[in-house]
Amino acid sequence: MIAVLKGKVLDKTLDSVVVDVNGIGFKVAVLPRELGSLNLNSEVVMYTSLQVREDGWFLYGFSDEETRKFFDLLLSVSGIGPKAALAILNEFTPEKLNWVIANKDEKALTKVPGVGKKNAQRLFLELKDKIGYTSFTSNEESVENFQDLWGDVYKGLLSLGLSAAEAREILGKIDKKSVKTPEEGIALALRFLNK
């Protein structure tokens, strides 16, 4: 499998680039939001997913490993193909998509072209146990505000040496409504850790 490409951008289209790696040109489909940063003759490192189908072999490239992992994860959901997976990842960063899935934000997910209500429900069902975050809220808070605050708290706990599972467990116990800043959230989480 081709996992990483490091080379020079030779050509660019509306949805792909050709990357020259030691004289071999690889055509790689990329996210539209990442296409603008890929300039001709620039050196790139792309984390890739090779998809083999009846009609050919296709490479999908991403600027980071986390996005590539999410692409493969989305493809594991029945009814989600590469086109829909790219559309979802073009709309959401992996971190934001974690929150959308954990909080079952159907409204946000169905705004993505090609993702209807059934696909959104299937994503929630099939990925709920595979994503990195746990749902920290049950109310209608916006994903952006909630993610910013609690994403920072989560990252802060990880940087303090907690495992992802420990951080999720502690965050699941915290009363979210009383916390206004990441610092308050981390302090409260550390109190739970010491109990």
From Swiss-Prot:
What GO CC annotations are associated with the protein? cytoplasm; Holliday junction helicase complex; Holliday junction resolvase complex
Which cysteines are cross-linked by disulfides? none
Region described as Domain II: 64-142
User: Which residue spans adopt a coiled-coil conformation according to this UniProt entry?
Assistant: none
Source taxon at top rank: Bacteria
> Gene3D superfamilies annotated for this entry?
5' to 3' exonuclease, C-terminal subdomain, Nucleic acid-binding proteins
Single annotated GO MF? ATP binding
Which CDD domains does the entry link to? UBA_RuvA_C
Key word GTP-binding present = no
Where is the segment annotated Domain III?
Answer: 152-195
Can you say where in the cell this protein is located?
Answer: Cytoplasm
Where are the stretches annotated Domain I?
1-63
Q: Biological process (GO) annotations?
A: DNA recombination; DNA repair
The answer to whether keyword DNA-binding applies is yes
Q: Which UniProt keywords apply?
A: Cytoplasm, DNA damage, DNA recombination, DNA repair, DNA-binding
Q: Matching Pfam families, A to Z?
A: HHH_5 (PF14520), RuvA_C (PF07499), RuvA_N (PF01330)
Q: Which InterPro entries match?
A: DNA_helicase_Holl-junc_RuvA_I, Hlx-hairpin-Hlx_DNA-bd_motif, NA-bd_OB-fold, RuvA, RuvA_2-like, RuvA_C
Give the family this protein belongs to, as stated in its UniProt record.
Belongs to the RuvA family.
NCBIfam families linked to this entry: ruvA
Instruction: Please describe what this protein does.
Output: The RuvA-RuvB-RuvC complex processes Holliday junction (HJ) DNA during genetic recombination and DNA repair, while the RuvA-RuvB complex plays an important role in the rescue of blocked DNA replication forks via replication fork reversal (RFR). RuvA specifically binds to HJ cruciform DNA, conferring on it an open structure. The RuvB hexamer acts as an ATP-dependent pump, pulling dsDNA into and through the RuvAB complex. HJ branch migration allows RuvC to scan DNA until it finds its consensus sequence, where it cleaves and resolves the cruciform DNA.
Q: What is known of its domains?
A: Has three domains with a flexible linker between the domains II and III and assumes an 'L' shape. Domain III is highly mobile and contacts RuvB.
What's the subunit arrangement here? Homotetramer. Forms an RuvA(8)-RuvB(12)-Holliday junction (HJ) complex. HJ DNA is sandwiched between 2 RuvA tetramers; dsDNA enters through RuvA and exits via RuvB. An RuvB hexamer assembles on each DNA strand where it exits the tetramer. Each RuvB hexamer is contacted by two RuvA subunits (via domain III) on 2 adjacent RuvB subunits; this complex drives branch migration. In the full resolvosome a probable DNA-RuvA(4)-RuvB(12)-RuvC(2) complex forms which resolves the HJ.
Q: Report the protein name in the record.
A: Holliday junction branch migration complex subunit RuvA
Taxonomy, top ranks, is:
Bacteria, Bacillati, Bacillota, Clostridia, Thermoanaerobacterales
Please state the gene responsible for encoding this protein. ruvA
